[in-house]
Amino acid sequence: MNKENKLIPGLPSGFEDRWGKKLILKKKLINTIEANFVKFGFGALETPSFEISENIGSFLADDDSNPMSDVFSFKDGEKNITLRYDLSSPLARFVAQNNQELPLPYKRYQMGDVWRNEKAGNARYRSFLQCDADIVGNVNPAQANAELCNLIASTLLACGLKKDQFVVNISNRKIVQGLIEDLKISDDKKIKVMRAIDKLDKPGFGLRGVEDLLKEERVDASGAVTKGANLTDDQASQIINFLKVKDLKELKENLKNPLSQEGIKELEDLLEIVSYGDYLDQIKTNFTIVRGLAYYDGFCVETNLNFKAKNSKGKEVDIGSICSGGQYNKLISRFKGVDIPGTGMSFGVDRLLFAMMQLDQIEVDEKKPVIICVMDEKYLKNYYEILKVLRDNNINSEIFLDSKKNLGKQLTYANKKQCPVAVICGENEFKDNTITLKNLLGVKGENNQLTFPKENLINEIKKFI
């Protein structure tokens, strides 16, 4: 390949590599979340990254004329297949396919990457890891949804957040659906209304942005136009007034629609069960939470942080929701012969990691390896004998792989890798049956080398790691 045709390395917008400390932190976060899911009685499930497009549904898209516009879809022979955009739709397919063998209620958790063909932004990725927990089956909805709320709060505390650093916002879609009925909004506009409301806390929206989406169109700062729901001024005004209400009692007095009253009662029942536990102060009603996915039809939850983060340019940004979900009574019943309700929630791990790294509150005991320097190639067998002793004693260790490089270059590599100690043995050490260690984290200018009998290797090296 000539110079003119050399490739320029880079990533598509909305994707990132993770390595080193960031990846170790992410794995610790995942392990903490998983341990808490298991503690709450959830069992693991794994499904493929691809699903048949008609099975996964088109619950994400804002553009009705192109229902698969927000996902990555491909032609596979006679069928279209789609990279999963969440873990709930694959769960619905799995339950419909295996419901005879599953214990119901089925409490499952799943961790896996999802893909969305959306506009990228601060802590908004087009590929990200979700950690889901769902309860599927005919159960008491208040109990199941309270279990999810308690799980969210408990997990965030286990991850290292403090009680005043997050809020679990809960609502019920039936409340606003009742208002939509009273306003005689046509069926073809209902999902657009829901998605407009869901944008309320998104950057650049607020009440004004939502009102634009409820009416004819919204033009963002870049000039991009999003078609609105084409409501009348009165319809849009009444929805905006609804979004300003904060008190459940006030809502109960003003909204008399039976469906709205049903949603309010379900919220009251949920809050009563939540009050039996330890997390009532972290769980708040917020009637603007409706969730943008079309399959939710009752309880909704969205968890936000009470602090801002800074992007790579040092500018304060809103992180957005780090955990969300809700109740879906018809997602599974789309499949023939199955009518099973469900409720669930999902942590956006990459967004949560972004927040935790901002706080510097997640610590990792990262055990860097001991490095064995190769001073003389004729003693290579001896170096590998030392390596075996270290690894047999569960000490992270490696041998330098290029014996042609001098000691200085080997130590430069070790320092770049942040190795705590180097084994430096040459002809004298092997003749005297001794080992020399160099403390690579020691104070510069001091004597950081120590020579001792070979049989003391493990005891001496443990002083440095």
Swiss-Prot record:
UniProt-recorded Gene Ontology molecular function terms: ATP binding; histidine-tRNA ligase activity
Keywords annotated in UniProt: Aminoacyl-tRNA synthetase, ATP-binding, Cytoplasm, Ligase, Nucleotide-binding, Protein biosynthesis
Enzyme Commission (EC) number: 6.1.1.21
Subcellular location: Cytoplasm
Pfam family, one: HGTP_anticodon
InterPro entries according to UniProt: aa-tRNA-synth_II (IPR006195), aa-tRNA-synth_II/BPL/LPL (IPR045864), Anticodon-bd (IPR004154), Anticodon-bd_dom_sf (IPR036621), His-tRNA-ligase (IPR015807), HisRS-like_core (IPR041715), HisRS/HisZ (IPR004516), HisRS_anticodon (IPR033656)
Cellular component terms (Gene Ontology): cytoplasm
A Gene Ontology biological process term: histidyl-tRNA aminoacylation
SUPFAM superfamilies: Class II aaRS ABD-related, Class II aaRS and biotin synthetases
EC main group: ligase
Record has Cytoplasm as a keyword: yes
Catalysis: reaction(s): tRNA(His) + L-histidine + ATP = L-histidyl-tRNA(His) + AMP + diphosphate + H(+)
Assembly information from the UniProt record: Homodimer.
Assigned protein family: Belongs to the class-II aminoacyl-tRNA synthetase family.
Protein name from the UniProt record: Histidine--tRNA ligase
Gene that specifies this protein: hisS
